[in-house]
Amino acid sequence: MKGKIKKYVALVLSVQQLLCGCSATELEDRCFPMMAVVDEKDGQISFGYGFPKLSQKDNTDLEEARVNIAPVTGKTMESCVQTYDSGLEKLADCNHMKVLVFGENLMEDTGRYADVLSYLKQTGLFPRNIYVCVAEDPLALFETEEDLPQDLGSYLEQYLQNQESAGSGKLFKLGRLLDEKENHIPVSYTHLRAHETLRHL
């Protein structure tokens, strides 16, 4: 009987070690975008992530990790995400994401915008608690990043929270946006201007 117990304990410990090893390996194979931008360009969806300069998990330089690639375009949000992910050296883990920025061009294309929201609701690609805002040209926001003390996603999160605290309006998070759009409730977004955003924090 004691022999069987020892074998069982050894088996359990082996499985635990295997699982721990897999988790560590999976973590090393992930990258952690802090924000996402989605816009419409020349009749197609434009999509990309914003990453921290240094990985928050292992302090790996972005160039070394080879995760910071240019935005991509495609006919649908799904095809854009697939194309972008295929260009990454690591799996994009969006659980730490702070902000989702839509472009004004996308907002004006109501059909394409509705398709994007439908895709996000069906897939759960991004956390429901991330902030959502709009920019005339989301990609222009990246041009300000070199002058920032932190990654753009974390910076925008703090900026939006400061704006809300100052009484500049109620912020929308993705979960609420998806729910209210489904119920046909009008939504008022926070609009960003690249240089104004940089000055106000």
Please name every model-derived segment.
Residues 2-9:
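Bacterial N-terminal signal peptides that target proteins for export
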Residues 3, 17, 21-201:
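A glycine-rich, acidic short-motif signal
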